[in-house]
């Protein structure tokens, strides 16, 4: 994020801004002066290429601190004044309640239920403020030990009771479907084409549209991406030679002697697939 172009004599604010806006506190919890002072503290933090480990190999990169390029003057950041460097900035950021809340809301959004898009968080409260508060407290109490925080999350009632509250990302759709149908445990001809399917659904793997990443939840779905999802899943589930599909068919055949009405067959199949919930095309009024 351009910190290699962040020098004591010419401060580049890109990394400082992204650190505060996207990766720790969120918009509205710092000032423009904080962005500049944060960026000053990270001057001299850069990357250095290493010699390739093999002929014509890729150049790895490693962190390098160039003391002569570091601004060692006094800085004031979020109310703290001193000869601050990048490590001090991280400590100060992690001591802010806004950071704990930001991390907690991201965890809730990833594991429990879709939240509004991140840029709106400054003005839009969480869907479940109590859950986010519980996670934020766990972040602070554990001093950012994510194992402890996730234990609180996974043991909570709001996590256990969450169902049909998240729209899968394209990567989750593709990987989950391939796991369900089976036969893709090891690399095989055609697996590369399967990996492209997420891109057709709107998530070009390892190529997010910006440093912010992808917008999730309902923004995964539009008329084109929905068709891609349905067609991909239908094609995989129609291949009765796949071990996972065969297992679903066998389990259905073993239920009630394999005798179902059309409605019962669809319901039983959906239960074995997820469960998956669908609505009637024309629900009763």
Short names for language-model regions:
Residues 96, 100, 104-142, 150-285:
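Flexible, low-complexity segments enriched for small/polar residues
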């Amino acid at each position: 994020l351009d910190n290699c172009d962040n020098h004591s004599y010419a401060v580049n604010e890109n990394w400082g801004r992204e650190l505060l806006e996207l990766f720790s506190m969120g918009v509205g919890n710092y000032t423009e002066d904080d962005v500049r002072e944060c960026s000053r503290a990270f001057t001299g933090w850069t990357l250095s290429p290493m010699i390739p480990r093999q002929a014509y190999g890729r150049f790895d990169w490693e962190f390098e601190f160039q003391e002569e390029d570091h601004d060692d003057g006094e800085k004031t950041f979020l109310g703290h004044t001193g000869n601050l460097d990048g490590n001090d900035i991280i400590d100060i950021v992690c001591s802010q309640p806004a950071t704990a809340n930001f991390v907690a809301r991201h965890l809730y959004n990833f594991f429990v239920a879709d939240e509004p898009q991140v840029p709106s968080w400054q003005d839009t409260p969480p869907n479940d403020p109590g859950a986010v508060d519980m996670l934020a407290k766990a972040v602070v109490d554990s001093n950012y030990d994510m194992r402890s925080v996730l234990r609180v999350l996974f043991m909570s009632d709001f996590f256990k009771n969450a169902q049909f509250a998240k729209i899968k990302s394209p990567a989750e759709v593709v990987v989950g479907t391939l796991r369900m149908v089976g036969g893709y445990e090891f690399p095989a001809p055609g697996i590369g084409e399967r990996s492209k399917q997420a891109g057709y659904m709107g998530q070009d793997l390892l190529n997010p549209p910006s440093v912010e990443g992808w917008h999730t939840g309902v923004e995964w779905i539009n008329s084109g991406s929905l068709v891609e999802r349905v067609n991909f899943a239908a094609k995989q589930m129609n291949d009765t030679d796949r071990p996972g599909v065969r297992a679903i068919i066998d389990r259905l055949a073993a239920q009630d002697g394999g005798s179902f009405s059309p409605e019962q067959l669809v319901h039983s199949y959906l239960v074995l697939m997820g469960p998956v919930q669908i609505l009637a095309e024309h629900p009763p009024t």
